[in-house]
């Protein structure tokens, strides 16, 4: 399913994550690979702990960081697409 601003995303239940000195560290239980996010990536991860529309994630990131809406949307979608490909995030259709 293609990712869009209307998509609902949520962290996959097939991973475990922890905050380690301000960085989010994840272990994919399906691939046994470790991942690490810092800064904005960690904040996005916090926001998708529960099912959340991508548009809402962008609203929060654009408000909290000095970034244009267009750049924010492109970066958030790119980050989430990589997470989906890695099996760390599940995508649900939008409303």
Map each language-model feature to its residues.
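Long, charge-rich, low-complexity alpha-helical segments
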Residues: 20, 33-95
């Amino acid at each position: 399913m293609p990712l869009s601003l209307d998509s609902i995303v949520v962290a996959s239940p097939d991973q475990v994550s922890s905050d380690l000195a301000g960085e989010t560290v994840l272990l994919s239980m399906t691939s046994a690979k470790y991942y690490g996010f810092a800064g904005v990536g960690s904040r996005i991860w916090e926001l998708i702990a529960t099912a959340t529309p991508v548009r809402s994630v962008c609203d929060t990131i654009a408000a909290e960081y000095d970034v244009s809406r267009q750049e924010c949307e492109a970066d958030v979608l790119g980050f989430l697409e990589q997470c989906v490909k890695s099996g760390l995030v599940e995508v649900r259709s939008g409303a």
